[in-house]
């Protein structure tokens, strides 16, 4: 018996494999898989329920229905194993062979495989160089195709209709051969000689001139080469033998009531068999051609339906009018094999329940209901009960557990001790959505969750449910404890800040404790230590907020690393002294000697983690939470209606605003302003009124007047509950309080435009009907948004994960000197992100020098931690080059140095860390959060009043960046370039502020002038866009004809008239081709030139432009010739944000992208065509000039004769990432995408580290286009993996040959996922059919490098703890294989087993 067990063990061993190859199956291969031909469409006998012989479920072909029993019942039991019954022909074996044995159908006529025919581009079509239409006409018997022209004038592959064929027959007789149907295509494919074709095409390629033809030939060449290298034969795309799926994979299940539930595949197979048999019969009978043809066509159609129903023509439907599910449908889509069963599997040993708060738990614990624990840990309990001798058998143990005898609970306590469980809350958006805890048994039926981990789970207690999973094996428990325990996940992987920060009640309690109150009870007392202060508080001598002096003892570490105690007397409050009791030793008292808002608490925890490490932080966090809850309870903070204090100034402010609006209304009626301007100005007035009201309200709420000890009135921060909640960051914001006690403000319509009548009431006063109706708009839009956007965001995350899944840290250092240049991010007067935040946790790529010296401050390859960042800041360095994954040189992964610090752990990243997936989660998770948070301000329009000037905040020197300007008659500069920026530089040369200023800005200062803080240095009109004259002279109207290209509007009040240019669409036919413009002429009537160029000064006027000058009026430099009214602005919401992020990662081209200069040189304009201008750039070195056609309505930033640099903006618009990559290089495109994505998230106050976005960009840049193939195997213009090209180039250089040159290409994340090397990963993502077709034709083999492929084949992933397993496998594969025991074939194994069994049987 021992031998038998040993043998069975041997059999169950899985095969080790290095990769998975996919290819086309030849007819012989299909027959070799098969165990017999299926000849009849019958399935099972309806009376006996036994499978019919030679039918679709035949036991002879596919194996027995019952274990070790033949169909007729002659041979039963194990001892007859392997015998083939002579009566029914069934082999006696296990029934599970019915899952793996295949059959086949011999087709009476060949049939084209629909995937290779219809999946675009059609492979059969490319192969034969025929159009898909023609091939379909042949296959579906509509026309003939010439196969062998013989000596006739026909050509091979020529199409002949029925008439043509008959004519040809009369003319040539049997000189030639023409056929129809799949046989014809089969013969054509068979006739292709791959090698000859390849040679011919390679020779032909260089001489082809037309671009389209070259592309076509290259495509065909690649296909034929793929066939040639993979060993596939083209004729295998036509099926002669059809494999039949094993019956247990397409089951037929009897239901009660004599009906059957069946898989759709059985119906599809039955159709094929029926038609095939009929066709055989017709051929035997030598039926008329037309009937046979029809039958063949029907056979082709039924095989099409079986393989991919609905790909051609209408889908075949079953009895219930629903399309049948074909083989292709089985594997694709969310319910297909890949996503349903291979990537997402269900878990046993899990339970779920509602969660409640566990305020008394420690951070590493969760409360598990006893009932649940008993069920989840059953096998462990049975084992323990048996082991302790309390139960004799498993059955007895089961009875004990069912009766719930007291011993069971003791055993359960034992089993659970130190056995972590994992809690998961759906949706699991990032890795913190599953964490491990030690269970604590509780009564009741709800799981208790520690409040501090709620932020990570995004959980609240309004009915959320969570799932519990039990790690069973020792390794799983170890991993759960060391990697997933909640105490080991304190920092967020997205930004490296603590994720277990207290929120809400805890913050409120701590804030309340640390506040000070003037003249509180016990003010001015002095205490010898904290304990004495506590005594005074407990006995009621001093209150919590009293300002007192306390002597405190601190422990600090000195230079030598010894712990030193210091004592000092501090001005503080009793509450803060109490807080210092829970402060871990080694932290400064100053950290709690302040008002503890949410930000301060977060900083406190962060400092604690960096200075004292994990353990102290965890304990401290728990203590903070207990204290916070305690004092929040004691504080008695509550919200009452009287807490919402409405400021007295509100009513006067609203009245003023109303008066202003009336004034503008009058101006509009008298024609001084256009409708658009009026709307914009009204909105501005209300926006600023709203600001003023909310300022007044906050001033009113935040301060209260009290009498101090000396009897003098003094202001102090108020103890108003609502104000405390908002100020501490516990709940609510100024914007929400404004709606309660200020005014609701402007509301947005569902389309995002702003309703111009604001809601002046607030919630305390209450809204009237019309106000209520307006506010429902915004609120409803928010709810609808949420529903739609959640799905969108989930899809974005899925695409991100898919593109980045195979990126893993695989080596220590790639040694590159490349990197990204980091500067502080400055927008307007604020430093949005200082340099230290951008470089923290990165590795320096090149030595950083002390400013102005040659002294190295930070050597290359230093990991910048907090201490280094302090040094960088102290030396006022404002740019440095740091390593980045984008410039990492590692093939198939990245190195530790280029990635830098692991944000969730605080040290340099480990090998094997799956940085791709972490990056995708970090970007996707807040996406979902944000989309869910659109409506929280109730749709209140969050738009500040439009800016119309620049007011500096710091003193310094003014610098202009890419600005062109003219000096007007008052000696002031007027900006005449589009993308100009002002910067303020301090005396150390560091940039402090940077502002974008529009065209037409008037500057109050000159360049390099000193400016002082608070000064206004630039002004412009935000509502109109001027056209500025660059020369002085008099104006002359061209093509300005009243009623044709423009109309006059006269103001009734002032009698002033202005000219409004009509849009092309509004003009009569005569004016369509005209181009209204203003030309400047000198006194003598001659044309004036723009200074420094040969271009006449003429300005084209777009539609809607308003001109306030008359013909021949004089004009000065820098004066406005015309104004173009600007459109009203829409509110910025992440709604615009999420699609924006998706567009950036998909690298979509914007609608009207900016036009960039393709080469450096001088601008001129060539001959104009209808509606387009011809822009010509002539390079300075006399190279080939570059031409581009630009639509006339595009506003150009350049004039004739101007010099431009490559990549400079010629016409404004959103820049396209592809253009930036092509013209400005890889680093610029990386910076562009990172900054744009960050802008969207920053607007919502979400922090994501730049690294994560860079990781995605690296994956978008992993393909390149070959420019010149050199001596390599690549084709020019082909798309290849960058790492492949680099490896090939290294080999070529080593042999002294010419390497290939290439240009990097930017692919959107969907395209990049589908273009990955691994076809398994691509097929499980999207477009399964296309990916598999392509892979099969090319005979691709998947090396199983990524995570997804390994999950699909059921292995450990090559990351995390599975990394070492894969390393070992790779090493073992590299070693020469040791001599192994000779492998035995399956049939020998069966034989051996049969012998063993017979032995065992005869010994019985």
UniProtKB/Swiss-Prot annotation:
GO cellular component: DNA-directed RNA polymerase complex
Binding site for Zn(2+) 2: 814, 888, 895, 898
Single GO biological process annotation from the record: DNA-templated transcription
Keywords per UniProt: DNA-directed RNA polymerase, Magnesium, Metal-binding, Nucleotidyltransferase, Transcription, Transferase, Zinc
Pfam families registered for this protein in UniProt: RNA_pol_Rpb1_1, RNA_pol_Rpb1_2, RNA_pol_Rpb1_3, RNA_pol_Rpb1_4, RNA_pol_Rpb1_5
Residues that, per the record, bind Zn(2+) 1: 70, 72, 85, 88
Subunit structure, as described in the record: The RNAP catalytic core consists of 2 alpha, 1 beta, 1 beta' and 1 omega subunit. When a sigma factor is associated with the core the holoenzyme is formed, which can initiate transcription.
Function: DNA-dependent RNA polymerase catalyzes the transcription of DNA into RNA using the four ribonucleoside triphosphates as substrates.
Protein name in the entry: DNA-directed RNA polymerase subunit beta'
Source organism of this protein record: Shewanella pealeana (strain ATCC 700345 / ANG-SQ1)
Record lineage: Bacteria, Pseudomonadati, Pseudomonadota, Gammaproteobacteria, Alteromonadales
Gene: rpoC
């Amino acid at each position: 018996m021992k031998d038998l067990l040993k043998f069975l063990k041997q059999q169950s061993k899985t095969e080790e494999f290095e990769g998975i190859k996919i290819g086309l199956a030849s007819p012989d291969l299909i027959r070799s898989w098969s165990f017999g031909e299926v000849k009849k469409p019958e399935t099972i006998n309806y009376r006996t329920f036994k499978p019919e012989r030679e039918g679709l479920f035949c036991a002879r072909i596919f194996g027995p229905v019952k274990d070790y029993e033949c169909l007729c019942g002659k041979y039963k039991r194990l001892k007859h194993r392997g015998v083939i019954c002579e009566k029914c022909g069934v082999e006696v074996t296990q029934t599970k062979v019915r899952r793996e044995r295949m059959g086949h159908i011999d087709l009476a006529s060949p049939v084209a495989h629909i995937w290779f025919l219809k999946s675009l581009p059609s492979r059969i079509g490319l192969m034969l160089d025929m159009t898909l239409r023609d091939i379909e006409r042949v296959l579906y018997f509509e026309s003939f195709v010439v196969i062998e022209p013989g000596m006739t004038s026909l050509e091979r592959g020529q199409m002949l209709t029925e008439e043509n064929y008959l004519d040809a027959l009369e003319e040539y007789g049997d000189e030639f051969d023409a056929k129809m149907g799949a046989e014809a295509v089969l013969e054509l494919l068979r006739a292709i000689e791959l090698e000859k074709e390849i040679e011919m095409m390679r020779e032909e390629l260089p001489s082809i001139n037309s671009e389209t033809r070259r592309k076509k030939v290259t495509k065909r060449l690649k296909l034929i080469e793929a066939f040639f290298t993979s060993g596939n034969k083209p004729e295998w795309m036509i099926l002669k033998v059809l494999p039949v799926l094993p019956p247990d994979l397409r089951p037929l299940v009897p239901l009660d009531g004599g009906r059957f539930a069946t898989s759709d595949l059985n119906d599809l197979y039955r159709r094929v068999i029926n038609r095939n048999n009929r066709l055989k019969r017709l051929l035997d009978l030598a039926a008329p051609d037309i009937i046979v043809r029809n039958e063949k066509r029907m056979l082709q159609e039924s095989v099409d339906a079986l393989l991919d129903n609905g790909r051609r023509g209408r889908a075949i439907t079953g009895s219930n009018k629903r399309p049948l599910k074909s083989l292709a449908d089985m594997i694709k889509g969310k319910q297909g094999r890949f996503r349903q069963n291979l990537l997402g599997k269900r878990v046993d040993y899990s339970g779920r329940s509602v969660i409640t708060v566990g305020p008394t738990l420690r951070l590493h614990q969760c409360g598990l209901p006893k009932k649940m624990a008993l069920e989840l840990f059953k096998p462990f309990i049975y084992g323990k009960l048996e082991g302790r001798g309390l139960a004799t058998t498993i059955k007895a143990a089961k009875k004990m557990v069912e009766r719930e005898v007291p011993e069971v609970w003791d055993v359960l306590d034992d089993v659970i001790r130190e056995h972590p469980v994992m809690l998961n809350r759906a949706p699991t958006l990032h890795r913190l959505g599953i964490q491990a805890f030690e269970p604590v048994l509780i009564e009741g039926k709800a799981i208790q969750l520690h409040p501090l981990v709620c932020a990570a789970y995004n959980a609240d207690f309004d009915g959320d449910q969570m799932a519990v999973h039990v790690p069973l094996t020792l390794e799983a428990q170890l991993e759960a404890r060391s990697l997933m325990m909640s105490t080991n996940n304190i920092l967020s992987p997205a930004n490296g800040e603590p994720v277990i920060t207290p929120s809400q009640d805890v913050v409120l309690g701590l804030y309340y404790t640390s506040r000070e109150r003037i003249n509180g009870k016990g003010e001015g007392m002095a205490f010898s230590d904290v304990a004495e202060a506590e005594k005074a508080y407990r006995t009621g001598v001093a209150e919590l907020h009293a300002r007192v002096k306390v002597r405190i003892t601190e422990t600090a570490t000195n230079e030598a690393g010894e712990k030193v105690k210091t004592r000092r007397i501090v001005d503080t409050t009793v509450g803060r002294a109490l807080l210092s009791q829970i402060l871990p030793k080694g932290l400064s008292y100053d950290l709690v000697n302040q008002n503890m808002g949410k930000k301060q608490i977060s900083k406190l925890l962060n400092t604690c983690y960096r200075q004292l490490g994990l353990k102290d932080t965890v304990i401290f966090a728990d203590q903070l939470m207990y204290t916070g809850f305690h004092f929040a309870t004691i504080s008695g903070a509550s919200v009452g209606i009287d807490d919402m204090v409405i400021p007295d100034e509100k009513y006067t402010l609203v009245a003023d605003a109303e008066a202003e609006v009336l004034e503008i209304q009058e101006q509009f009626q008298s024609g001084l302003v256009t409708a658009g301007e009026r709307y914009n100005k009204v909105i501005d007035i209300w926006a600023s009124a709203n600001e003023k009201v909310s300022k007044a309200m906050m001033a009113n709420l935040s301060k209260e007047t009290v009498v101090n000890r000396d009897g003098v009135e003094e202001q102090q921060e108020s103890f108003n509950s609502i104000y405390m909640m908002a100020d501490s960051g516990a709940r609510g914001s100024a914007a929400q309080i404004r709606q309660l006690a200020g005014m609701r403000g402007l509301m947005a319509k569902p389309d995002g435009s702003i309703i111009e009548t604001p809601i002046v009431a607030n919630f305390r006063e209450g809204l009237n009907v019309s106000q209520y109706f307006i506010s429902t708009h915004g609120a409803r839009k928010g709810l609808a948004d949420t529903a739609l956007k959640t799905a969108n965001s989930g899809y974005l995350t899925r695409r991100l994960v898919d593109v980045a899944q195979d990126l893993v840290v695989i080596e220590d250092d790639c040694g590159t000197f490349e990197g990204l240049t980091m500067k502080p991010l400055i927008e307007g007067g604020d430093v949005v992100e200082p340099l230290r935040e951008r470089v923290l946790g990165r590795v320096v790529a090149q030595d950083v020098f002390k400013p102005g010296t040659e002294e190295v401050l930070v050597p290359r390859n230093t990991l910048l931690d907090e201490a280094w960042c302090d040094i960088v800041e102290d030396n006022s360095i404002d740019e440095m080059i740091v390593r980045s994954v984008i410039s990492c040189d590692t093939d198939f992964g990245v190195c530790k140095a280029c990635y830098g610090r692991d944000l969730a752990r605080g040290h340099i990243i480990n090998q094997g860390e799956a940085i791709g997936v972490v990056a995708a989660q970090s970007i996707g998770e807040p996406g979902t959060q944000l989309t869910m948070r659109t409506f929280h301000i109730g749709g209140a329009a969050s738009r500040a009043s439009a800016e119309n000037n620049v007011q500096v905040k710091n003193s310094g020197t003014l610098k202009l960046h890419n600005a062109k300007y003219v000096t007007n008659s008052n000696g002031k500069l007027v900006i005449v370039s589009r993308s100009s920026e002002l910067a303020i530089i301090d005396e150390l040369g560091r940039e402090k502020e940077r502002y974008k200023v529009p065209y037409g800005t008037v500057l109050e200062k000159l360049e390099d002038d000193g400016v002082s803080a608070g000064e206004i240095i630039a002004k412009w009109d935000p509502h109109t866009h001027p056209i500025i004259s660059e020369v002085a002279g008099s104006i002359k109207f061209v093509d300005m004809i009243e009623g044709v290209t423009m109309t006059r509007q006269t103001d009734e009040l002032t009698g002033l008239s202005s000219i409004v240019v009509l849009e092309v669409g509004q003009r009569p036919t005569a004016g369509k081709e005209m181009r209204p413009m203003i030309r400047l002429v000198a006194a003598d009537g001659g044309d004036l030139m723009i200074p420094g160029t040969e271009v006449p000064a003429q300005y084209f006027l777009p539609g809607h432009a308003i001109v306030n000058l008359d013909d021949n009026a004089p004009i000065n430099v820098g004066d406005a010739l015309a104004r173009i009214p600007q459109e009203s602005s829409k509110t910025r919401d992440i709604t615009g944000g999420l699609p924006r992020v998706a567009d950036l990662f998909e690298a979509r081209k914007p609608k009207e992208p900016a036009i960039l200069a393709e080469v450096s040189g001088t601008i001129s304009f060539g001959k104009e065509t209808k509606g387009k201008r011809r822009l010509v750039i002539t390079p300075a070195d006399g190279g080939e000039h570059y031409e581009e056609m630009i639509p006339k309505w595009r506003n150009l930033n350049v004039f004739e004769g101007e010099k431009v640099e490559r990549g400079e903006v010629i016409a404004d618009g959103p820049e396209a990432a592809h253009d930036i990559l092509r013209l400005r290089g890889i680093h610029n495109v990386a910076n562009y995408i990172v900054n744009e994505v960050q802008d969207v998230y920053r607007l919502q106050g979400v922090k994501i580290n730049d690294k994560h976005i860079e990781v995605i960009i690296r994956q978008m840049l992993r393909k390149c286009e070959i420019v010149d193939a050199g001596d390599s195997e690549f084709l020019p213009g082909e798309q290849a993996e960058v790492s492949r090209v680099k490896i090939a180039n290294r080999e070529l250089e080593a042999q002294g040959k010419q390497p290939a040159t290439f240009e990097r290409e930017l692919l959107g994340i969907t395209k990049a996922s589908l273009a990955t090397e691994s076809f398994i990963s691509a097929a499980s993502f999207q477009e399964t059919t296309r990916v598999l077709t392509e892979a099969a034709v090319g005979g691709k083999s998947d090396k199983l490098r990524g995570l997804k492929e390994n999950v699909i084949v059921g292995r450990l992933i090559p990351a995390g703890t599975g990394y070492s397993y894969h390393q070992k496998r790779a090493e073992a594969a590299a070693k020469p294989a040791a001599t192994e025991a000779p492998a035995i074939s399956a049939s020998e194994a069966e034989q051996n087993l049969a012998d063993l069994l017979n032995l065992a049987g005869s010994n019985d």
